[in-house]
């Protein structure tokens, strides 16, 4: 074994091989660290919610909830860009082209920095007008703005971590991003208690704690890459990225970014409809959405695993392996749905009470109903997410983007037509209905992909 081969073996010793061996076993091994990472990343926001709800009350909880969709809009575009850049890196890794991989990293840093700064500036000037446009109740407007503006100023920190973690996952290493998040999540809990309960900083303390904790993740991730994963560090010659690769990175990242932001924009529109239903309804919905963010994690984690799996096997030229993998992912989504339905039927109201800290009947009733009505559609959501990510990984940039337009238009229709008539019941049914339409569309597009399903000669 040569010195170069030995070095590469050491560098990739934590990697899961997604291009060879048993498919489902490899997917699960790769997915589990992502699932645990997502769990602790969600704890950033959920710990905020629990402490805010229990220490500061329902009004402060509603303030954070009222800007939740805007937060997703701000961050979603940046995260989508990061995922798009990682897809290109995973293809290069699957093709075993180290030079292309390093040039991809160099181009990703340039595009990522520009995108995150743009998002931060847009949020800085547009957040207050957007909160007012969304008819945020006057009693929570100032707290909502105080929380979201701090989060906005930390977007670059969140983006930096997700890009770094995405590049590690692109080469099959999903373990180290988990380690960094475990450490920073513990810090986040300590800072939450200190800033909110100890120093009396209110909702601003929750936002500051989240940004600082995620900043620690960034530092740890960068130090690890510099010390142990030199293959992700471009040299001077790799700074000449080339127009073609820049375009591939730009178009892939913009497609993913727009897809995420259009979905988030639909959530902003839906939040407008929810804001008109009163503070207690907002509080109940906020608690339910926090719990939903936990229960759909197994689906999101597998969709992320599908993205890397499909990207690497696309780069390696293995369509049959992609077909088999996607079938197993669809079956996995069905199992997740069954488990979630059983859990929600038994414990939905107790979970809402635990997260919100509220004893108001309307808060508990609405939150529990949301969880019980949406959980039977989790199999559809799993198919939607994994197929959307797979199509992006196959180089489809426009057709998956169209699915997010369907979602946006569906939410607009519900806000204008159904929520005024059926109130919170329409809010609950909005997303399951949209999921069904999008899943049908995306599966049809996937079945027509010429690489995965080539026409017989």
Stretches found by the model and what they are:
Residues 1-31, 89-156, 198-254, 310-377, ...:
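Short alpha-helical transmembrane segments in multi-pass integral membrane proteins
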Residues 33, 69, 193, 348-349:
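Short, proline-centered helix/strand-breaking motifs
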Residues 34-87, 151-158, 220, 247-313, ...:
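Transmembrane helix-bundle signature of multi-pass secondary active exporters and lipid flippases
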Residues 41, 45, 49, 53, ...:
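Juxtamembrane/transmembrane-helix interface segments of polytopic membrane transporters
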Residues 46-49, 121, 129, 163-167, ...:
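Alpha-helical transmembrane segments of multipass membrane proteins
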Residues 54-57, 91-94, 170, 199, ...:
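Membrane-helix boundary and inter-helical linker elements of multi-pass secondary transporters
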Residues 61-121, 158-177, 284-348, 381-395, ...:
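Small-residue-rich hydrophobic transmembrane alpha-helices
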Residues 82, 151-169, 177-185, 206-221, ...:
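Short runs within selected transmembrane alpha-helices of multi-pass transporters and secretion channels
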């Amino acid at each position: 074994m040569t010195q170069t081969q030995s070095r590469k073996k050491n560098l990739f010793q934590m990697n899961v091989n997604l291009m060879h061996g048993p498919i489902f076993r490899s997917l699960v091994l790769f997915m589990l660290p992502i699932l645990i990472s997502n769990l602790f990343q969600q704890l950033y926001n959920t710990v905020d919610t629990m402490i805010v709800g229990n220490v500061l009350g329902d009004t402060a909880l509603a303030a954070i909830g009222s800007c939740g969709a805007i937060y997703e809009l701000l961050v979603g575009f940046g995260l989508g860009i990061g995922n798009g850049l990682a897809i290109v890196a995973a293809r290069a890794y699957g093709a075993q082209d180290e030079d292309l991989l390093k040039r991809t990293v160099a181009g990703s840093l340039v595009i990522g920095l520009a995108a995150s700064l743009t998002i931060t500036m847009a949020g800085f000037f547009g957040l207050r007008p957007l909160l007012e446009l969304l008819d945020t109740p006057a009693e929570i407007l100032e707290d909502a703005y105080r929380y979201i503006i701090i989060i906005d100023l930390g977007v670059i920190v969140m983006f930096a971590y997700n890009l770094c973690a995405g590049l590690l996952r692109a080469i099959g290493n999903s373990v180290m991003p988990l380690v960094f998040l475990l450490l920073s999540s513990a810090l986040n809990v300590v800072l939450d208690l200190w800033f909110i309960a100890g120093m009396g900083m209110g909702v601003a303390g929750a936002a500051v704690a989240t940004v600082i904790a995620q900043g620690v993740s960034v530092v740890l991730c960068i130090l690890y890459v510099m010390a142990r994963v030199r293959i992700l560090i471009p040299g001077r010659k790799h700074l000449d990225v080339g127009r073609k690769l820049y375009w591939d990175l730009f178009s892939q990242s913009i497609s993913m970014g727009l897809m995420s932001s259009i979905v988030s924009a639909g959530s902003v529109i839906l939040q407008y409809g929810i804001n008109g239903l009163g503070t207690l309804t907002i509080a109940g919905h906020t608690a339910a959405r926090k719990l939903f963010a936990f229960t759909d994690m197994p689906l999101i984690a597998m969709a992320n695993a599908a993205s890397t799996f499909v990207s690497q096997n696309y780069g390696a030229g293995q369509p049959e392996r992609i077909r088999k993998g996607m079938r197993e992912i669809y079956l996995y989504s069905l199992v997740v749905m069954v488990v979630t339905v059983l859990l929600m039927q038994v414990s939905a109201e107790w979970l809402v009470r635990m997260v919100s800290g509220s004893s108001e009947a309307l808060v508990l009733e609405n939150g529990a109903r949301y969880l019980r009505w949406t959980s039977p559609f989790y199999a559809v959501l799993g198919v939607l997410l994994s197929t959307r990510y797979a199509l992006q990984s196959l180089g489809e940039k426009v057709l998956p983007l169209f699915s997010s337009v369907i979602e946006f238009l569906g939410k607009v229709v519900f806000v204008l037509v159904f929520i005024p008539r059926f109130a919170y019941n329409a809010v609950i049914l909005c997303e399951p209905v949209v999921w069904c339409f999008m899943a049908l569309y995306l599966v049809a597009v996937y079945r027509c992909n010429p690489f995965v399903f080539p026409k017989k000669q």
